[in-house]
From Swiss-Prot:
It is found in: Nucleus. Expressed in leaves, stems and flowers. Expressed in trichome cells and in leaf primordia. The gene is GL1. One of its GO terms (cellular component) is nucleus. Residues 11-63, 64-118 form the HTH myb-type domain. The keyword Transcription applies. Disulfide bonds: none annotated. This is Trichome differentiation protein GL1. The keyword Transcription applies.
Length: 228
């Protein structure tokens, strides 16, 4: 009972809050003379009104000459980010792999800088991707899909010809299918995609007329769909 009351009395006498320069000097002198460990003896040996845990953390996180108090470098930031992906918020394990940094330093730097930086980079990447998706395609070529080409191949040229102004229409009825597939390719220039007719449309810029004969033969036969 007496021991418990004595411990409670000592706990009530412990000082909390910011450390003073005088307290730091007392702690450093003790560690230099007696080494680390047995932190609870500091109160009895020096009269310092700090608990053993507070003394240990003060030494490890601030007073130790092994602690790097400078700004974090880009290499350290990259290392912490990669370690955090593997270990999560296990700051002690991360700090052991970052020389000169304590777990408290790493945790504080992550919460105040790196986490916000990563969120900002992700938002910028999403915004850039969204802007790119909104831009119209420079070349759009479609033909009847394989599932519909059987029903639409007979009138594909007539439908395309009706959907554009100033387009030269190929007379499908007067020519054999093989001749149409090899020679009659219908192209129209327009900047307005609203002139599309269903899935059977050809939209290119004025400078993009050089298409290979093989591509155009496939387009005429309705076997493939091109969207570049």
């Amino acid at each position: 009972m007496r021991i418990r009351r004595r411990d409670e009395k000592e706990n009530q006498e412990y000082k909390k809050g910011l450390w003073t320069v005088e307290e730091d000097n007392i702690l450093m002198d003790y560690v230099l003379n007696h080494g680390t460990g047995q932190w609870n003896r500091i109160v009895r040996k020096t009269g310092l009104k700090r608990c053993g845990k507070s003394c240990r953390l003060r030494w490890m996180n601030y007073l130790s000459p092994n602690v790097n108090k400078g700004n974090f470098t880009e290499q350290e930031e990259d290392l912490i980010i990669r370690l955090h992906k593997l270990l999560g918020n296990r700051w002690s394990l991360i700090a052991k792999r970052v020389p000169g940094r304590t777990d408290n330093q790493v945790k504080n730097y992550w919460n105040t800088h790196l986490s916000k930086k990563l969120v900002g980079d992700y938002s910028s990447a999403v915004k850039t991707t969204g802007e790119d998706d909104d831009s119209p395609p420079s070349l759009f070529i479609t033909a009847a899909t394989p599932s519909s080409c059987h029903h639409q191949q007979e009138n594909i040229y007539e439908n395309i010809a009706k959907s554009f102004n100033g387009v030269v229409s190929a007379s499908y009825e007067d020519k054999p299918k093989q001749e149409l597939a090899q020679k009659d390719v219908l192209m129209a220039t327009t900047n307005d995609p609203s002139h599309y007719y269903g899935n059977n449309a050809l939209w290119v810029h004025d400078d993009d007329f050089e298409l290979s004969s093989l591509v155009m033969m496939n387009f005429a036969s309705g076997d493939v769909e091109y969207c570049l």
